[in-house]
Regions:
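Alpha-helical/coil-rich non-catalytic "connector" segments in signaling and regulatory proteins
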Residues: 1-254
Length: 256
């Protein structure tokens, strides 16, 4: 998705610029619009539209970032040059725009802190307090071998994440690992652990290779559509941090 970490809240208000440019060829998204038939698609904008209208987009168009209300057809999902994030069909375009504004307003400070951690070469474990500042629910970031890269929790509200480790190791206990692996084989979404704990899974891949998974446990607050959008956004940003200079202390990656 181009709905990634180069977008700031201010970008959606028409102000260009971002704190992290790992690729000089990458430009910021500069606006969020409700799609209307007949308009000329513009690059680097987010278009909000119903799934049934995707077929009406001209065959020749710039690279587009779309929020589809309802699940698109397989043909649309595979169409080149269209990055699509689809959401539940009960949402209206106006609700999506409102969610986007809230999302990026909430995300701005989070992104700046991620940027700082990246530039300081901090390990993934340094993410824990940053994640807690954005997500009320416990969140677990795991690597390709189901090792725990980051663990965020409010100990006053929940101790479940404390019990997710396999003994005193840095790996998930088998029951959590099995549940998370099943969720990561597909596109993620809402699932639950063998203990019956609901969670939201967002797998992050590069060229079909699983890099890591983000798991938000629903133990303090119900999972929301905003959580899903924000986790997708966060996952792609963390992937870009890996590409720049984020150090994974477990796997011994070196600064690039």
């Amino acid at each position: 998705m181009k709905l990634n970490g180069w977008i700031l809240a201010e970008d959606l208000k028409g102000v260009e610029g971002s704190s992290l440019k790992s690729d000089p060829a990458e430009l910021c998204l500069t606006g969020a619009l409700i799609w209307q038939e007949g308009i000329l698609p513009r690059a680097y904008h987010v278009y909000v539209m119903y799934a049934g209208d995707l077929e009406r987009i001209p065959k020749k168009h710039p690279a587009l970032t779309l929020v589809s209300i309802g699940k698109p057809s397989k043909e649309c999902l595979e169409r080149e040059g269209m990055d699509i994030l689809w959401v539940r069909p009960y949402l209206t375009p106006q609700m999506i725009l409102s969610l986007l504004m809230k999302l990026f307003e909430k995300y701005r400070m989070f992104e700046e802190e991620l940027d700082r951690l990246c530039r300081d070469g901090k390990p993934f474990s340094a993410l824990a307090p940053v994640l807690l500042s954005v997500f009320s629910n416990p969140i677990i970031l795991v690597g390709e071998h189901m090792e725990i890269l980051a663990l965020s929790q409010n100990e006053d509200a929940c101790r479940i994440p404390c019990e997710c480790r396999d003994g005193d190791t840095d790996f998930l206990r088998p029951s959590f690992a099995r549940s998370f692996c099943r969720a990561c084989k597909g596109e993620g979404g809402v699932s639950e652990t063998e203990e019956g704990i609901p969670f939201l899974a967002v797998p992050v891949r590069k060229e079909d290779k699983f890099l890591f998974g983000i798991f938000l446990l629903s133990v303090t607050m119900p999972l929301t559509e905003l959580d899903r959008i924000l986790l997708c956004h966060t996952g792609q940003y963390l992937r870009s941090l890996l590409r720049v200079n984020f150090i994974n202390s477990y796997q011994g990656m070196e600064r690039m």
